[in-house]
Amino acid sequence: MGRRATSITLAVVCLAVLLGATGLFAISRETSYMQECASEGFAIDGYYRDDKTSLEILAFLEEDGCRWQLVNKDGSSVDGQFKRTDDPNILILKKENGEEFGTIHVAYISRRRDQGQLYLFRDSKVTRFYLVSTKPAFTVESGDVDADV
């Protein structure tokens, strides 16, 4: 084997080792993030659309008194506060009048917060929502959107 072939082989082996180490590091970071979120709770601020019709929008803003809002298919909305349970990825939604509205199960939110999925349990039905944006948006009485930046 010539000197050139040995150099090329060595370069390929080094590149393979580097790529393998990078892959393991990325997997380790994602695993660490998922473990932390499973025990501490995922950051849920943002708004979500239902995955069947995309007509229902569910918004959350934890920093502002744990607010939530659901805008229904007909444009009507329900507002209230939420509270995390002992399982920090299970949320109890209460309307503004204190009446219980439903329960949220946060399935996952990606580390970069560009993907996510949660489930709303209410009136004996389950609706799956997917993350649209991490910028919460709430509808106000006039029908305008109140973008909380």
Annotate each language-model stretch with its function:
Residues 89-112:
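An anionic, turn-rich surface loop/hairpin at beta-sheet edges
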Residues 51-97:
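N-terminal glycine/threonine-rich, aromatic-flanked beta-hairpin/loop signature
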Residues 32-36, 77-86, 120-149:
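Edge beta-strand at a domain terminus
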Residues 19-34:
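Membrane-interface motif at the C-terminal end of an N-terminal transmembrane signal
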Residues 1-18:
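N-terminal Sec-pathway targeting helices
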Residues 30-56, 82-84:
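Tryptophan-anchored aromatic micro-motifs
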Residues 66-68, 89-91, 113-119, 126-127:
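Hydrophobic residues embedded in beta-strands of well-ordered beta-sheets
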